[in-house]
């Protein structure tokens, strides 16, 4: 049973029981809608950064209002991601886009970069909103509703530097010890993640290369239309034909541009998001292993140093519960993530295949129409030449 769906509130009457039944075919009623838009650039003497408007509309009772509007910068999104990982170490947190991918600082905040990031941040928040557990996280609610000064104040309430350093040291120590007896199902999960990471990174590189080649092809093809127009000015007998060729090239250029837009907006972001997911999954597995390694070390101490371990059995019991909760959370989220991944990848490639079919049909029809017109023209000229 999924513990997240269990409610301790028992129905008090047959009618209330019927009202609480949820049929599998019944669609989920979405009650949280988030939009990320209107990026704004801010320049100070210290730094330059972008903030994004976040509009939240909800019918949930735990929110003080039905609509909220706040502005957040990338650092705030990083904070939220960190808090979610801290609260749910073995849940699969959606990935954030990289801080920046640039060749030079001049390109850092160009329009394409800002729009690409805006879309990624929008997807990040909506994936959290759609998650059965993360959507009810208190830090997520504060992120969506608190004004800037309130969020800043809330951030300061977290663990201090020394506490965070202590957690890091313990995590490193656990990872150094490693896990001696990782359960078989998590061995299989780890193998899947490694193989998935290799394949999705390869697909990402190939997709980027295809887009680059498409861009080069498009840039070169754009030059041929004007060339044929200029050529027609010096060929009196071929004026109409050359202009028709230029028109066909122009239509094919527009079709190519549309296909490139589909590639850059539909396929590339999905593939790259799952590249980032593969990195997130490796982090989740490490955190699960750290929890188990902590339990293993306590059991080892109890086994070899029984004289000085009066409190160890109680600690071990708590750690066993912690490991069980971590494992169950990961297993449930793993199946959910795999289903979403398969649906997303399938939809992206299916849409791209349909886009390609439409593109080639459009270009083929353009040139077939041109050839038909030229054939008819030659037939007319031939009939006119007959005595």
From Swiss-Prot:
Residues 178-387 form the BAR domain. GO terms for biological process: endocytic recycling; mitophagy; piecemeal microautophagy of the nucleus; positive regulation of autophagosome assembly; protein transport; reticulophagy. One of its GO terms (cellular component) is early endosome. It is found in: Early endosome membrane. Keywords: Endosome, Lipid-binding, Membrane, Protein transport, Transport. Residues 30-151 form the PX domain. GO terms for molecular function: phosphatidylinositol binding. It is a peripheral membrane protein. Its main location: membrane. A 1,2-diacyl-sn-glycero-3-phospho-(1D-myo-inositol-3-phosphate) binds at residues 73, 75, 103, 117. It holds the Pfam family PX. PROSITE patterns: PX. Gene3D superfamilies: Arfaptin homology (AH) domain/BAR domain (1.20.1270.60), Phox-like domain (3.30.1520.10). It comes from the Eukaryota. CDD domains: BAR_SNX7 (cd07666), PX_SNX7 (cd07284). Belongs to the sorting nexin family. Involved in the regulation of endocytosis and in several stages of intracellular trafficking. Together with SNX4, involved in autophagosome assembly by regulating trafficking and recycling of phospholipid scramblase ATG9A. Heterodimer; heterodimerizes with SNX4. This is Sorting nexin-7. The gene is SNX7.
């Amino acid at each position: 049973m999924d513990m997240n769906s269990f409610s301790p509130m028992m129905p008090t009457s047959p009618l209330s029981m019927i009202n609480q039944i949820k049929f599998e075919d019944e669609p989920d009623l979405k009650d949280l809608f988030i939009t990320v838009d209107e990026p704004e650039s801010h320049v100070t003497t210290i730094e330059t950064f972008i903030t994004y408007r976040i509009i939240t509309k909800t019918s949930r009772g735990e929110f003080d209002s039905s609509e909220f509007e706040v502005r957040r910068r990338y650092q705030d999104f990083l904070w939220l991601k960190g808090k979610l990982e801290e609260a749910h170490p073995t849940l699969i947190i959606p990935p954030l886009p990289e801080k920046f991918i640039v060749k030079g600082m001049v390109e850092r905040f160009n329009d394409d970069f800002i729009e690409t990031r805006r879309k990624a941040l929008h997807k990040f928040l909506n994936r959290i909103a759609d998650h059965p557990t993360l959507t009810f996280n208190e830090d997520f609610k504060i992120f969506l509703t608190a004004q800037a000064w309130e969020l800043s104040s809330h951030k300061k309430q977290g663990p201090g530097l020394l506490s965070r350093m202590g957690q890091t040291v313990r995590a490193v120590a656990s990872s150094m010890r490693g896990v001696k007896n990782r359960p078989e199902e998590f061995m299989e999960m780890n193998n899947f993640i490694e193989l998935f990471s290799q394949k999705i990174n390869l697909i990402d590189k190939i997709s980027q290369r295809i887009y680059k080649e498409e861009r080069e092809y498009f840039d070169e093809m754009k030059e041929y239309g004007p060339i044929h127009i200029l050529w027609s000015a010096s060929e009196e007998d071929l004026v109409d034909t050359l202009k028709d060729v230029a028109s066909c090239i122009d239509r094919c250029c527009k079709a190519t541009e549309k296909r490139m837009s589909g590639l850059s907006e539909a396929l590339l972001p999905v593939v790259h998001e799952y590249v980032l997911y593969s990195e997130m999954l490796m982090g989740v597995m490490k955190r699960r292993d750290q929890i188990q390694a902590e339990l293993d070390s306590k059991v080892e101490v109890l086994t070899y140093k029984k004289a000085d371990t009066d409190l160890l059995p109680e600690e071990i019991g708590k750690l066993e519960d912690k490991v069980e909760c971590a494992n169950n959370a990961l297993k449930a989220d793993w199946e959910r993530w795999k289903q979403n991944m398969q649906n997303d990848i399938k939809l992206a490639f299916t849409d791209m295949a349909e886009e390609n079919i439409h593109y080639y049909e459009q270009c083929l029809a353009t040139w077939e129409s041109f050839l038909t017109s030229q054939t008819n023209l030659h037939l007319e000229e031939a009939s006119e030449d007959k005595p």
